[in-house]
Amino acid sequence: MKAAIHGVYLVTDTNIQDSYSHLEIAELAIAGGVDVIQFRDKKMAANEAYKIANTIAQLCKKANIPFIVNDRVDLALAVDADGVHLGQNDLPLKEARQLMGSNKIVG
């Protein structure tokens, strides 16, 4: 079991604001000292989500900040995210844990 996440946990969501892109939000947050970044976009096409999430994942790795993907276990695995955040209608926890492995965050 992973330890609890503490500190400032940022969720990038361009559906609740349209002034900044996911990437701009992540860059500003990293510069500001954020502790965790979660990529969240429920409407984006898979190929576009992959490109953006992969870029943010690399930025987070360089900054030693955990990167979480919202809802999408497939995307989390594809970009080697540190974890996945599951909602009520997403893949069941047991299956997500099996796919993600014991060293990743599943919540």
Predicted segments with their positions:
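Conserved N-terminal beta1-alpha1 strand-loop-helix module at the mouth
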Residues: 1-91, 98-106
